Regions:
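Penicillin-binding protein/beta-lactamase superfamily catalytic region
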Residues: 8-12, 22, 150, 154, ...
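Alpha-helical transmembrane segments of multi-pass membrane proteins
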Residues: 91-94, 143
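Conserved catalytic neighborhood of penicillin-recognizing serine enzymes
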Residues: 1, 5, 9, 57, ...
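Active-site proximal loops enriched in glycine and acidic residues that flank catalytic Cys/His/Asp
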Residues: 55, 63-66, 116, 153-154, ...
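Short active-site loop/helix that positions an aromatic residue
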Residues: 99-100
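Active-site-proximal helix/loop microenvironment
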Residues: 171-190
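Periplasmic/cell-envelope proteins involved in peptidoglycan metabolism and beta-lactam response
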Residues: 1-86, 90-92, 103-107, 159-168, ...
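Short beta-alpha connecting loops at secondary-structure transitions
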Residues: 77-83, 121-130, 181-184
Length: 190
C-alpha cells in the first residue's frame, strides 16, 4: 500500500471527501520508505524511523513515511511517528545557548564546568555518564553535554526558553499546571 500513514491521515481529516489528492512524489516516497526500513532493521528489532519531506515554498508534503514498516507490529508500524509527541532531547541546547548569548551571559568561548552538579533534587548526568571538567560553550554544544546546558538554562530561566520555543511556533507539552523546570534542557517536555 502506498503511503499508508499519509492516506489514513487524509481520510481521517477529510472524511466527507469522495476523492483525496495528495502532493506526494511517488518516487521520493518509495525511496524513503525503503531507506527507513533498511536503516531501522540495521539498528535493531524495536527501532523504527519516520520521515516527512515538505516543500518550504509551497507547503506541499512530498513524502510522508510514518514508520519503517507499516505492517511490523514489533516496531509499532501502524503508529505515524511524524505526528507523535516526542521528547525533543538535545535539540533545545542550541536555543538555550543562543538565549545566553543574546542576554550577554555567555559567548562560544565562555568556560563552563562539566562536573557533577545538583540543582535542588535534580542531578543531571551526561549521556555517557562521564565528566570533562572545564569546557567552552562551543565544546559543550559540540559534544551535547547535559550538565553545561542545564547550568546555562539555570541562568537563562526555563520560562524564557519555553517562551522562545512558543515564539517560533512550537507548543511544548508540559505536565498540566506545572511550570517548566530545568529538565526541559534535556528534553523533559513533549
Amino acid at each position: 500500500r502506498f503511503a499508508p500513514h499519509a492516506s489514513e491521515t487524509e481520510v481521517r481529516e477529510r472524511p466527507h471527501r469522495n476523492l483525496h489528492r495528495l502532493t506526494l512524489s511517488r518516487e521520493l516516497q518509495a525511496q524513503l520508505e525503503t531507506l527507513a526500513r533498511e536503516h531501522a532493521r540495521a539498528l535493531g528489532r524495536r527501532i523504527s524511523a519516520a520521515v516527512l519531506v515538505v516543500d518550504n515554498h509551497t507547503g506541499e508534503i512530498l513524502a510522508h513515511v510514518g514508520s519503517s514498516d507499516y505492517l511490523d507490529e514489533a516496531r509499532f508500524g501502524a503508529i505515524d511517528m511524524t505526528g507523535a509527541i516526542r521528547s525533543p532531547g538535545s535539540t533545545l541546547k542550541p536555543i538555550i545557548y543562543g538565549l545566553a548569548f543574546e542576554a550577554g551571559l555567555a559567548h562560544p568561548e565562555t568556560l563552563i564546568e562539566d562536573r557533577p552538579t545538583r540543582f535542588g533534587q535534580y542531578a543531571p548526568k551526561n549521556f555517557d555518564e562521564d565528566f570533562r571538567g572545564s569546557v567552552t560553550i562551543r565544546e559543550a554544544l559540540a559534544h551535547s553535554l547535559n550538565i553545561p546546558a542545564v547550568k546555562v538554562l539555570n541562568a537563562v530561566g526555563p520560562a524564557r526558553l519555553i517562551a522562545r520555543i512558543r515564539s517560533i511556533g512550537v507548543e511544548p507539552v508540559l505536565p498540566s499546571h506545572e511550570q517548566p523546570s530545568l529538565a526541559v534542557a534535556l528534553g523533559g517536555v513533549g
